[in-house]
């Protein structure tokens, strides 16, 4: 009989296109500056929090800690696409299993 592994975490992975401020620290021509627009950014990561005010994504995980965190205001998200779901088990984080 195969022993069923206990799921430690399950996270959905998303691709997100979002709007952010653009800034320039050099001198710019007045007319050229009028053509400037906000930036469209791209993030791919695992969704941790989603609410009406923001989405929190992370890109790395080890045990109970995450890294490479991006918090995007929900109102700035232009497009979001679910890629897949990642299921992690306790033994995925045990050194001797790799």
Residue ranges and their predicted role:
Residues 2-98:
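Conserved RNA-binding domains used in RNP assembly and mRNA/RNA metabolism
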């Amino acid at each position: 009989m195969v022993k069923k592994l206990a799921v430690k975490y399950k996270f959905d992975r998303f691709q997100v296109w979002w709007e952010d401020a653009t800034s320039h620290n050099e001198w710019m021509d007045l007319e050229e500056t009028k053509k400037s627009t906000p930036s469209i950014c791209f993030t791919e990561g695992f969704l941790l929090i989603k609410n009406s005010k923001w989405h929190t994504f992370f890109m790395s995980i080890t045990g109970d800690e995450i890294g490479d965190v991006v918090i995007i205001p929900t109102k700035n998200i232009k497009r979001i696409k679910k890629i897949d779901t990642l299921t992690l088990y306790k033994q995925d984080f045990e050194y001797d299993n790799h």
